[in-house]
């Protein structure tokens, strides 16, 4: 199963910051098991929402030069509140440091202004062909796919 957890990017400043939202609905299949009778977004998916938002900032900042943006490290993660169906998880990330392919962020997720998750994350941008030249065509296909998704979730201000 593939999770696209960013419904909309609300603010984007290349190389600096991103804000985005995830609207949680009962249609999310994983809620049937997490937890029966008390559906809440799993903490790992709250973290993944931060990771995906950071990935969009990296891709946009680098004009989609890399086909993969992967989680390298998580530090100081805190889960403070539940995210329930009907809630909107608003995530905000700011760049702490960027060194070559590595991007470090401070990230927070809030529901109605109350902290739900916070973490420091490190992401690595790469192309599959860097590790296996036979995967160059996969890089192109992935990049094109990400560009198409990005156009659906981000509308630049007029």
Where are these regions (language model features)?
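Catalytic strand-loop segment that frames the active site of acyl-thioester-processing enzymes
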Residues: 1-41
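Hydrophobic core residues within well-ordered beta-strands of beta-rich domains
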Residues: 3-5, 89, 103
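Hydrophobic residues on conserved beta-strands that form the core of alpha/beta folds
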Residues: 6, 71-74, 104, 118
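Conserved positions in beta-strands of structured domains
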Residues: 7-10, 75, 80, 94-96, ...
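Active-site helix/loop of acyl-thioester processing domains in fatty-acid/polyketide metabolism
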Residues: 9, 41-66
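HotDog/MaoC-like acyl-thioester-processing domains
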Residues: 14-15, 85, 96-158
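Beta-strand residues in well-ordered beta-sheet regions across diverse protein folds
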Residues: 21, 92, 106-108
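Hydrophobic beta-strand-centered segment that forms part of the acyl-chain substrate-binding groove
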Residues: 54-90, 116, 124-126
């Amino acid at each position: 199963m593939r999770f696209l957890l960013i419904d909309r990017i609300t603010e984007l400043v290349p190389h600096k910051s991103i804000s985005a939202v995830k609207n949680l609905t009962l249609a999310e299949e994983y809620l049937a098991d997490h937890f029966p009778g008390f559906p809440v977004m799993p903490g790992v998916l709250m973290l993944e929402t931060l990771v995906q938002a950071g990935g969009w900032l990296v891709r946009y900042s680098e004009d989609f030069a890399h086909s993969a943006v992967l989680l390298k490290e998580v530090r100081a993660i805190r889960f403070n509140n539940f995210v329930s169906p009907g809630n909107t998880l608003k995530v905000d990330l700011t760049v702490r440091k960027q060194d070559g392919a590595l991007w470090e962020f401070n990230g927070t997720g809030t529901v109605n202004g109350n902290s739900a998750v916070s973490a420091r994350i490190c992401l690595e941008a790469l192309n599959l062909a860097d590790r296996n030249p036979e995967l160059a065509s996969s890089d192109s296909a992935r990049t094109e796919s990400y560009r198409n998704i990005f156009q659906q979730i981000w509308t630049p201000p007029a």
